[in-house]
């Protein structure tokens, strides 16, 4: 018997929140293409969505190349910042230009990590800065889906509550040099007031699991806004602590909630299986199981309609029932434009993949 639950194939499940952290894994002698294909097939997903990260210039290229290799895959593109903090607008690298390039290539949506406090500080531009205005306007007009990481758990601003592991990862924000927890939300409030029909999914339950009433108000106000249930484990502890309320919440707002795990390549294998097992059990079964912070959770065992909404229907409704096809010529132009911003090693690996897939 398998140690972890596998998704029933008839669910047509879509993994909405994956990443690529490197192009190649030495241990398994595997590229990210093989790694994510293993993940998709091993766990019985109908489709997966890879969200690019502004780590380096090659991340968008890798996501697009994965879509070429696996045309049933989705991908969300991201902005690349050649310098930080941004002192001025860089011609040809502004958000609107980059957005249009990514849409021409055939990305299915956009990913922004810019709301994570450490990256927010590094870039040096508030989320509601006029630098992004044209992009938000075009995004709203086009009804393009945005997967948006905004904030982190509130305890990351409190030195007495943030754990050492998170401090070591650079996730303590209470030294006075970072925008406050509430300050970041205020920036989003201004964006949403200005663009109320923006098709946006806030990752990690918008870090509002302690204040779900805030989400309820936003759901009533913004028709195309939702959240995903990608761990942070802290949200699942809040679900436990308010079990009956949250089970009703998930049923009532099942059309605003999407499945995701935040799994990455090359950190695959057992860790990915463990994450999906916990998330799926929580929404789809009434199992009691050990999960986040070694807490014993009890699953919500949501009704069929609510489960299907969360597991695949909401993604299809907001992103698309079928992925967009990659425009290979547009991708070649993008690689040519950005290749000088990559290391020699990245260039070599991307070139090898281009020779195989383009």
Segments (PLM) and residue ranges:
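Acidic (Asp/Glu)-rich catalytic clusters
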Residues: 6-8, 37-44, 61-74, 97-107, ...
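H/E-rich (His + Asp/Glu) clusters that bind or coordinate divalent metals
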Residues: 183, 199-358
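Histidine-centered catalytic micro-motifs
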Residues: 12-23, 147-151, 202-206
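Distinct, well-ordered alpha-helical segments
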Residues: 59-67, 88-92, 96-99, 123, ...
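Active-site neighborhood of phospho(di)ester-bond hydrolases with catalytic His/Asp-centered motifs
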Residues: 13-16, 49-54, 75-79, 111, ...
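An N-terminally biased module of ancient metal coordination in phosphate/nucleic-acid-related enzymes
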Residues: 1-68
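Active-site gating/metal-coordination segments in enzymes
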Residues: 60-171
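Acidic-and-aromatic substrate-binding clefts and catalytic sites of carbohydrate-active enzymes
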Residues: 22-32, 51-61, 82-93, 118-127, ...
């Amino acid at each position: 018997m398998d140690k972890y639950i596998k998704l029933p194939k008839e669910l047509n499940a879509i993994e909405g929140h994956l990443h690529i952290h490197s192009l190649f894994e030495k241990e398994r002698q595997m590229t990210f293409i093989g790694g994510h294909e293993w993940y998709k097939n091993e766990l019985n997903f109908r489709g997966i969505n890879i969200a690019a990260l502004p780590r380096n210039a090659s991340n968008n290229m890798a996501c697009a190349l994965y879509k070429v290799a696996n045309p049933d895959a989705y991908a969300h593109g991201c902005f690349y910042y050649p310098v930080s903090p941004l002192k001025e607008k860089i011609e040809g690298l502004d958000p609107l230009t980059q957005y249009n390039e990514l849409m021409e290539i055939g990305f299915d949506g956009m990913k922004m990590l810019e709301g994570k406090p450490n990256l927010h500080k590094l870039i040096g531009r508030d989320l509601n800065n006029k630098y992004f205005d044209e992009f938000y306007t075009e995004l709203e007009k086009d009804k393009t889906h945005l997967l948006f990481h905004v904030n982190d758990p509130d305890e990351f601003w409190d030195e007495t509550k943030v754990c050492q592991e998170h401090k070591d990862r650079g996730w303590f924000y209470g030294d006075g040099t970072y925008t406050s927890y509430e300050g970041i939300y205020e920036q989003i409030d201004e964006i949403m007031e200005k663009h109320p029909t923006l098709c946006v999914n806030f990752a990690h339950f918008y870090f509002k699991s302690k204040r779900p009433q805030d989400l309820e108000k936003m759901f009533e106000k913004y028709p195309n806004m939702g959240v995903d249930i990608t761990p942070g484990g802290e949200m699942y502890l809040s679900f436990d602590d308010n079990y009956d309320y949250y089970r009703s919440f998930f049923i009532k707002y099942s059309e605003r909630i999407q499945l995701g795990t935040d799994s990455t390549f090359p950190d695959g294998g057992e860790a990915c299986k463990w994450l999906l097992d916990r998330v799926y059990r929580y929404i789809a079964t009434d199992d009691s199981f050990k999960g986040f912070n070694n807490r014993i959770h009890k699953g919500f065992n949501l009704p069929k309609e609510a489960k299907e909404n969360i597991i695949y229907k909401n993604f299809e409704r907001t992103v698309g029932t079928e992925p967009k096809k990659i425009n290979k010529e547009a991708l070649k132009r993008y690689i040519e434009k950005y290749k000088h911003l990559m290391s020699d090693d990245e260039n070599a690996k991307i070139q090898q993949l281009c020779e195989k897939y383009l």
